[in-house]
Swiss-Prot record:
ATP binds at residues 171-226. Keywords: ATP-binding, Cell shape, Cell wall biogenesis/degradation, Cytoplasm, Ligase, Magnesium, Manganese, Metal-binding, Nucleotide-binding, Peptidoglycan synthesis. This is D-alanine--D-alanine ligase. Residues 135-344 form the ATP-grasp domain. InterPro entries: ATP-grasp (IPR011761), ATP_grasp_subdomain_1 (IPR013815), D-Ala_lig_Van_CS (IPR000291), D_ala_D_ala (IPR005905), Dala_Dala_lig_C (IPR011095), Dala_Dala_lig_N (IPR011127), PreATP-grasp_dom_sf (IPR016185). It catalyses: 2 D-alanine + ATP = D-alanyl-D-alanine + ADP + phosphate + H(+). It comes from Gloeothece citriformis (strain PCC 7424). SUPFAM superfamilies: Glutathione synthetase ATP-binding domain-like, PreATP-grasp domain. Mg(2+) 2 binds at E311, N313. Binds 2 magnesium or manganese ions per subunit. Its main location: cytoplasm.
Length: 352
């Protein structure tokens, strides 16, 4: 049987570069497992932090070391070229997190290449990345959410006379605590929990340095639960998992530092709540036009039984600590089986 050449694409220019490397390393291990080794050949392709694509031999070194490649100090303009091996790929497995990886830009390039790839297309990826657009789509789908406000960088930076009034409006509408987030970053990068006017002003300035679109959400006392989705037109939802942590909120350091957060799988919730979360996950998946895979995050207000959708991640992490593969393992699909199924789904979607 002829093996499929899987282009494992990782790295990238976002702040989640290191997460991408760790995810790619785990996927490469799963693709090399006995049940997959006879089906797939891995062709790793690494994108350096400056956006330069690196050939498989260099990419393999990065996978083995799990360390980013240093970028040249020479900043003179260069014309990046794809490694020639790119033309040998049968199916792409992109595992780039954040901007320029899961926001539709890379998906557009792969679509132009006319080669199958794992995950959502341009639309689903773009909607899933931009928190403001995502929330608009969720509202249209009738999915309940926390109260929020949207802002622009121009509102925060352009007129110092308007800024105090903007903060007044946030305080009156959302109160404290609230969360300030850049609209287009993942892994909690740039997010701040604020409890006072001074913290709010600082957080808004910080978020504006990351993105020109900012969202501010009301804080809610709730359990944080997540559900994984797998499939294309008839997707399935996994068991529900819960994240517990000792830090102030589920920030970048807590997410990716061993021992800082605990994943409880399955979550200890009533069966009716489990079913409702699964149904809402599938509704969110359809609403953004996702494909292949996604992880959907919720707030479960135990006191009232209310379930509020937080966000959908169309290219969730695949590190040793990541919720997505662990949810499917608890549902009965091992890591090697999961990556195999994702490749099958990519091929199916491409043939439609």
């Amino acid at each position: 049987m002829t093996k499929l050449r899987v282009g494992l694409l990782f790295g990238g220019r976002s702040g989640e570069h290191e997460v991408s490397i760790n995810s790619a390393k785990a996927i490469a291990t799963a693709l090399s497992a006995s049940e997959n080794a006879t089906k797939y050949d891995i062709l790793p392709v690494y994108i350096r932090k400056d956006g330069c694509w690196q050939a498989p031999d260099v990419a393999q070194q990065v996978l083995e070391s799990a360390q980013p490649l240093s970028t040249p100090t020479d900043k003179s303009p260069q014309l990046w070229q794809f490694p020639p091996q790119v033309n040998q790929v049968d199916v792409w497995f992109p595992i780039l997190h954040g901007p320029n990886g899961e926001d539709g830009t890379l998906q557009g390039l792969l679509t132009l290449m006319q080669v199958p790839y794992v995950g959502s297309g341009v639309l689903g990826s773009a909607v899933g990345m931009d928190k403001i657009t995502m929330k608009t789509v969720f509202a249209k789908a009738g999915l309940p959410q926390v109260k929020y406000m949207t802002l622009s960088r121009g509102q925060i930076w352009s007129n110092p006379c308007i800024f105090p009034k903007l903060c007044d409006e946030i305080e009156e509408t959302l109160n404290y605590p609230c969360f300030v987030k850049p609209a287009n970053l993942g892994s909690s990068v740039g997010i701040a929990k604020v409890r006072s006017r001074s913290e709010l002003e600082k957080a808004l300035d910080q978020a504006a340095s990351y993105d020109r679109r900012i969202i501010v959400e009301a804080g809610v006392i709730a359990r944080e639960v997540e559900c994984a989705v797998l499939g294309n037109d008839n997707p399935k939802a996994s068991v529900v998992g819960e994240i517990t942590f000792n830090s102030d909120f589920y920030d970048y350091e807590t997410k990716y530092t061993d021992g800082r957060a605990q994943l409880l799988i399955p979550a200890s919730v009533p069966d009716s709540i489990m079913t409702q979360i699964q149904e809402m996950s599938l509704a969110a998946f359809a609403a953004v036009d996702a494909a292949g895979l996604a992880r959907v995050d919720f707030f479960y207000v135990e006191k009232t039984g209310e379930i509020l959708i937080n966000e959908i991640n169309t290219l969730p992490g695949f590190t040793a600590f990541s919720m997505y593969p662990q949810l499917w393992a608890a549902t009965g699909i091992s890591f090697p089986q999961l990556v195999d199924r994702l490749i099958e789904l990519a091929l199916e979607r491409h043939q439609r």
